[in-house]
Amino acid sequence: MTTSILVSLAALIAVAFAVLGASKIRAVPSMQTRAAQVGFSVGAYKRIGVLEVAGAAGVLLGLAIPPLGVLAAAGLLLLMVGALGAHLRQHDGVAEMTPALVVTVLLVAYLWLAFGKI
């Protein structure tokens, strides 16, 4: 049971960060706008996107190499702490913060279960 939940969490996390990261790397208009709102250059947002895509790959590879998955998820969690901090600095409401909060909860759940695998 735990393994199937871990696989499901890894898949959800990987898809979310692959899509978000690719959007930042491609500098789609909504990401350019958000970068400007939080005071980041588009280049900085692209680098964050690279980290997100790498983290997504690391979480998936963590299904075969558990310590890698834990490290990747921990790195993504640090990115999310930064994202939540950016939301708070902008005085965003719950609606704007919900995606970041949901992904943070997924990462915490993944880490909780994955620690038992290493």
Map each language-model feature to its residues:
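Membrane-interface extramembranous regions
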Residues: 1-118
